Amino acid sequence: MLNSTSLYAAIDLGSNSFHMLVVREVAGSIQTLTRIKRKVRLAAGLSSDNQLSAEAMERGWQCLRLFAERLQDIPQPQIRVVATATLRLAVNAGEFIAKAQTILGCPVQVISGEEEARLIYQGVAHTTGGAEQRLVVDIGGASTELVTGTGAQTTSLFSLSMGCVTWLEHYFSDRNLAQENFDDAEKAARDVLRPVADKLRFHGWKVCVGASGTVQALQEIMMAQGMDERITLAKLQQLKQRAIQCGRLEELEIEGLTLERALVFPSGLAILIAIFTELNIQFMTLAGGALREGLVYGMLHLTVDQDICSRTLRNIQRRFIIDTDQANRVAKLAGNFLKQVENAWHIEPISRELLLSACQLHEIGLSVDFKQAPYHAAYLVRHLDLPGYTPAQKKLLATLLLNQTNPVDLSSLHQQNAVPPRVAEQLCRLLRLAILFAGRRRDDLVPEITLQAQNENLTLTLPDGWLAHHPLGKELIDQESQWQSYVHWPLDIR
C-alpha cells in the first residue's frame, strides 16, 4: 500500500509556467505519480520598474490553490517549492510569496540563478544518458541557464537574464513574425551570451542537451514531421523561415507545434538560434529531466548513477521478472554478430548500445502473455518511463521488439527517427538472429557462427553437420531466411 511518507513533491514557480511533480522512489530512481503544469506567464506581469502586477499575482495564486489540494497528502519535509527569475527580479515578490506560503502551507524559496542552474544540471545528470562532458541549456520564461559538467559534477554555471516570455514582450510585442523581429531578438540574445561564451568553451562539452519547453516543442515538431531527433542549426533556421511565412503569431501553424506552446515558441527559437550560433553547437538532444527532478533527487539524497541506461534496464528486468541469463545470452550473441559485420555496415556505438538494450528487454512481453509477446513488448517499452533514453530511442527499441520474430513490418522500422532506416533494418536482422540461435537457453548449445556482410547480403556459416543434427533448428532458420527475403534482406545459410 502506498502511504504518504513515501511521497515527495517538487514545485517550480517559473516565469512562464508553474509546475508540480509528485513522485515516489523506486529502486534508485523516481516513479512519477502526478505532473501538473499551468501557464501563468508571471514574467508578462513584470513592469519596467520590476513591479509584479496584481493580475499576474492572482494568476499565480489561483494555480497554487490547485497544487495545495495535492500537497495535503505529503509530509512537509518532503516538499520543496522554489521560485525562479521573475520572483528574483520583482521588487514586490515578498507580497506574492507570503500569500503563496499561506496557500501551500509550506515555505517558498527564491533561489539564485546559479542555484537554479545547479539543480537543473542535477536533474539532467540523474535522468539523461551519457556520463561524458555535457553542456546543459534551459530556456525559461525570464532567464536562461547554461551549465557545463561531467557526470554529477558541474564545471561552470551561468544564469542569464533572457527568456522566452521576456523576449516575447521585447521583440515580438507587435505579434509580427518578421525577419527583423527575429534579427533583433537573436542579436540581443547573442549580446547577453557573449560575456560567458569563452568560459563555457574553455570547459568544453562532447554532448549538448536542452531541458526547456522550447526544446520539448522542437522535439515534438521533429517527431511529428518524421525528422531525426537531433536539433541542429539548419533545422532551427528552417523552422524560423516557416514562422516568418506565417506572418503573425496568431497565425503560427507548424506541424507538431501545440497551441499551448505556440505563443512563446518564436522567442524561444530566437534565443536557441543565438545559443547555437554563439557557442557553435553541432547538435542538441532533449534532456530527461531538469529543475524539478533535481529538487526531488536532492531530497532523496540519491547518488548519480554513471550509467543511467543500465540502471533503467536492471529496474525493468526486476519489475517484469525478465530472465537476465537469457537476456545476457542474446546480448552476447548480438554483440558477437555486430563485431563480425562492423567493417561492412559501419554501425555507430550508440546504435550498438540500443541493439544491446533491445536484447536485454526482448522477453518483456512474456510478462503479459506468450501469445503476441512481441506486440506486448513493443507496447510496454513504448509507454514505460525509461530514464536515459530519448523519446526517439524508446520508439526504436519498441520497433525492434515488435519485429523480433514473425514477418517483418518494414514500415515501422522506417517510421522511427532515432537512426536511419537502413541502420534500423540492420539492427533488427541481428536481433532476430541472436534470439533465434540463443533459443535453447543454454550457453553450451549456442553454435559457433560466422556472419559476413556485403552491402545488404548476409552469409551465415554454421559448423559442419549442425543443420543435419538439428532438424527443428534448420526449420526455424529456413523460416527466418524466408521472412527476411520477403522484405528483400538476402540471408544465405551455409
UniProtKB/Swiss-Prot annotation:
One example of a Gene Ontology biological process annotation: nucleobase-containing small molecule interconversion
UniProt KW Metal-binding keyword: no
Enzyme Commission numbers on file: 3.6.1.40
Enzyme kind, highest EC tier: hydrolase
Keywords recorded for this protein, A-Z: Hydrolase
SUPFAM superfamilies found in the cross-reference section: Actin-like ATPase domain, HD-domain/PDEase-like
An MF annotation (GO) of this entry: guanosine-5'-triphosphate,3'-diphosphate diphosphatase activity
Classification via CDD domains: ASKHA_NBD_EcGppA-like
Entries under Gene3D superfamilies matching the protein: 3.30.420.40, Exopolyphosphatase. Domain 2 (3.30.420.150), Hypothetical protein af1432 (1.10.3210.10)
A family per Pfam: Ppx-GppA_III
Reactions it catalyzes: guanosine 3'-diphosphate 5'-triphosphate + H2O = guanosine 3',5'-bis(diphosphate) + phosphate + H(+)
Pathway linked to the protein: Purine metabolism; ppGpp biosynthesis; ppGpp from GTP: step 2/2
Similarity comment: Belongs to the GppA/Ppx family. GppA subfamily.
PANTHER family associated with the record: EXOPOLYPHOSPHATASE, RETROGRADE REGULATION PROTEIN 2
Function per UniProt: Catalyzes the conversion of pppGpp to ppGpp. Guanosine pentaphosphate (pppGpp) is a cytoplasmic signaling molecule which together with ppGpp controls the 'stringent response', an adaptive process that allows bacteria to respond to amino acid starvation, resulting in the coordinated regulation of numerous cellular activities.
Protein name from the UniProt record: Guanosine-5'-triphosphate,3'-diphosphate pyrophosphatase
Provenance organism: Salmonella arizonae (strain ATCC BAA-731 / CDC346-86 / RSK2980)
Gene that encodes it: gppA
